[in-house]
Design a protein with these regions (language model features):
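Bacterial Sec-dependent N-terminal signal peptides
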Residues: 1-25
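Early extracytoplasmic/domain-onset interaction patches
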Residues: 21-93, 430-459
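Secretory-pathway-linked proteins and extracytosolic
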Residues: 22-36, 155-159, 163-169, 176-313, ...
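Cysteine-centered nucleophilic/redox motifs
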Residues: 75, 148, 177, 298, ...
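Solvent-exposed beta-hairpin/edge-strand motifs
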Residues: 92-118, 172-189, 472-502, 568-594
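A surface-exposed beta-strand-loop module
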Residues: 104-167, 197-232, 288, 443, ...
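Hydrophobic/aromatic-rich core segments of domains that either
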Residues: 332-421
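Long hydrophobic segments that form regular secondary structure
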Residues: 416-528
Length: 657
């Protein structure tokens, strides 16, 4: 969280004023004389222990006939050491508007029984780089063994979908979620990665109360190669029925969302279609020989000349005619532009909504519309995708975390003259592993003085790997590009002594044709050499760049997550200097392979050939899946650490005879 601005903000008067206007909602009760809780010695080495995590979502009919939502969070936390104090000495609230606040309370309870109550005048605003605003307040007087207690309630427009992540790095002794709504509104709640006790109370004066409780939720740290957030315990909720207006009819289904999306994106005025027709004709897209060429031409044009901003409320950013004029679109607006162009060209396509698989999922059995955050366009004939809002990815490449997971496909269907869409939940495949790579080709020679190496190196990036680099190069100044090159070379072989460098295929359009991004550099380096008497020690293992080494003392919790399937191929050609021989070339032979049902899914293999004075080293490392189960963790570590072990290989060059 990058802090840009910290402004004092007195909220006390706002809270008092608002409280006088609130409908009757349940107030969070506090113990008038708090004492330090008894906590099991089993938790004494934890930086902090969350004694209570209580949340309440209450839906209320207001005087205007609208439904308002009130959200309450109440936590009590024991801090055991300096790390715990550092983590909880400031409390952040995701509330930006004072008029939304119903109540805020906080206090610190010291081991000697002293209580320090929050002065509400000390609540401040913190503005982020992206413009979002949080409220923040400091917990005063904290020492080891003290407890932090805070609660807040705020109101907002009702959201009929949501998720509450109830697990973090700290253990939680008691978790309680309560959802309160008028009895006509029937909510469903689904737990993920947890098994809470649940009960429903329909006797509370026209309200239904859903309660979910858990005890002893363990704290989980993030792990290397893991999707952390999506694997934490959470509760998702949605409005399933409104028995006052649609009794017995399930609301907010996936089919309902598909129809809504299709309707929003495929309604065009005659004037809009006329403008799009002129755009298509002026660019000659209808004359291109095939569908992929048309798709690529349209995408490259729109991403070159138009800007997209996610949260623009301006209706001009939705109107196709205004978008074509102003070159600025909202997310919905730019999808409408793509849709109208592909309609004009007669290209068959489907709208797709996807989630970021590291954070949440689109669940076929539970229709949480909030999880479908990101739009894609799918072309059934090619079985490929386009990402209309990601300027850094080009067909058929999409942001990797939006794939290898389920998506909502809006499949069009016609009844007479009426066309709509039905939902199909199915996987969004990523491109095959052999299309994405990070390769190195090096030719290495010892200089005449035998104290440094001349390395002629190519770093070759394809597929998803190339997209990130192209973004850096296309949105950078020349000075920034040189800095990127310098860092890439340094990270690869540890030297900044670059004699020459050039890049190839840096333009975004090269993604369409699968051309790799290439950095070609010639470098001098003495860091890979050492002398030991009359021997030369060549640290050839470092010529592939530093590799990850994995050791984990605790048991693995999460499945292994790879951002995208890929391989890394490295070839090294080393000219053995005259008069020398390599004493230990066999050190270059390594093999770690894992197979499922007889088919390789990951591996590391290195080998060599020695022909005359030419040493040719070939290394292949690959990961062909995005997820590996915990049961394969030890095998995964062996392969990851094989590349790290290769880093440590040192060839011994001895004088002949």
């Amino acid at each position: 969280m990058k802090k840009l601005l910290l402004l004092p903000l007195a909220v006390f008067l706002f809270i008092q004023c608002l409280q006088s206007q609130q409908p009757a909602i349940e107030k969070e009760e506090w113990t008038s004389k708090p004492v330090i809780h008894a906590v099991s010695p089993d938790y004494q080495n934890e930086p902090a222990v969350i004694i209570l995590d209580r949340r309440r979502l209450e839906f209320i009919d207001d005087s205007a006939g609208d439904v308002r939502e009130y959200y309450t969070l109440h936590k009590i936390i024991r801090v055991n050491n300096d790390k715990g104090i550092e983590y909880f000495n400031k409390i952040y609230l995701g509330i930006s508007d004072n008029t939304d606040i119903v109540d805020i309370k906080a206090r610190t309870i010291l081991p000697d029984g002293k209580v320090i109550v929050l002065d509400k005048n000390n609540i401040k605003d913190m503005k982020e780089e992206d413009g979002s605003v949080y409220k923040i307040f400091a917990m005063e007087g904290m020492v080891k063994g003290s407890e932090v207690e805070f609660s807040y309630t705020f109101q907002k427009d009702a959201s009929y979908f949501g998720r509450e992540v109830i697990q973090s790095k700290f253990p939680v002794l008691k978790t309680h979620l309560e959802l309160v709504a008028p009895s006509r509104l029937v909510f469903d709640i689904k737990p993920y990665h947890c098994s809470p006790e649940s009960k429903t109370d329909s006797t509370a004066g026209g309200k239904t109360i859903l309660q979910y409780s858990l005890s002893g939720l363990e704290g989980l740290e993030d792990e290397k190669y893991a999707s952390y957030t999506v694997n934490l315990a959470r509760l998702e909720y949605k409005l399933a029925y409104n028995n006052a207006t649609h009794r017995g009819e399930r609301l907010f289904t996936w089919n309902g969302l598909a129809k809504k999306i299709y309707g929003n994106y495929t309604y065009y005025t005659e004037s809009e279609l006329k403008k799009i027709g002129s755009l298509v004709k002026s660019n000659g897209w209808e004359k291109l020989p095939n569908e992929p060429d048309q798709i690529m031409a349209v995408e490259n044009y729109l991403k070159k000349y138009f800007s997209v901003r996610e949260n623009i409320d301006d209706k001009d950013a939705y109107d196709i005619e205004k978008i074509l004029k102003n070159k600025l679109a909202s997310t919905m607006g730019i999808v409408r532009v793509y849709s109208s162009i592909f309609k004009t060209l007669g290209i068959n396509y489907q709208f797709v909504l996807t989630a970021d698989r590291d954070n949440t999922v689109i669940d076929r059995e539970f229709e949480n519309w909030n999880n479908g955050d990101y739009p894609l366009i799918y072309f059934p004939k090619e079985n490929k995708f386009l990402s209309p809002t990601r300027m850094d990815f080009r067909y058929p490449w999409i942001y990797p975390s939006w794939g290898a997971c389920n998506g909502l496909f809006c499949k069009s269907t016609s009844i007479g003259d009426f066309t709509t869409a039905i939902a199909e939940i199915k996987p969004i495949p990523l491109e095959d592993y052999h299309e994405s790579y990070n390769n190195i080709e090096s030719k290495i020679n010892l200089n005449a003085a035998e104290d440094s190496l001349r390395i002629d190196m190519k770093q070759i990036f394809g597929g998803y790997s190339a997209a990130y680099l192209r973004e850096g190069f296309n949105f950078s100044t020349e000075e920034q590009k040189q800095s990127i090159i310098k860092e890439m070379v340094k990270s690869s072989i540890g030297s900044e002594s670059i004699l020459s460098s050039e890049t190839e295929n840096a333009a975004f359009e090269n993604e369409n044709t699968f051309k790799p991004f290439i950095l070609h550099a010639v470098v001098n380096s003495g860091d890979l050499l050492e002398r030991a008497g009359n021997k030369i020690l060549f640290k050839i293992g470092m010529a592939i760049g530093p590799q990850v080494e994995m050791y984990q003392e605790k048991a693995r919790h999460f499945p292994i997550a790879i951002e995208y399937p890929h391989f890394e191929e490295r070839t090294i050609e080393f000219s053995v200097p005259d008069g020398y021989t390599i004493k230990n070339p066999e050190a270059l032979k390594m093999e770690q392979i894992y197979k499922e049902n007889g088919e390789q899914t990951m591996g590391f293999v290195s080998d060599y050939k020695l022909t005359g004075n030419k040493l040719l080293v070939h290394i292949m490392e690959d990961y062909r899946k995005t997820v590996y189960p915990v049961s394969q963790y030890n095998d995964f570590v062996k392969i990851i650490n094989a590349s790290s072990d290769f880093n440590k290989i040192v060839l011994v060059l001895e004088k002949k005879g």
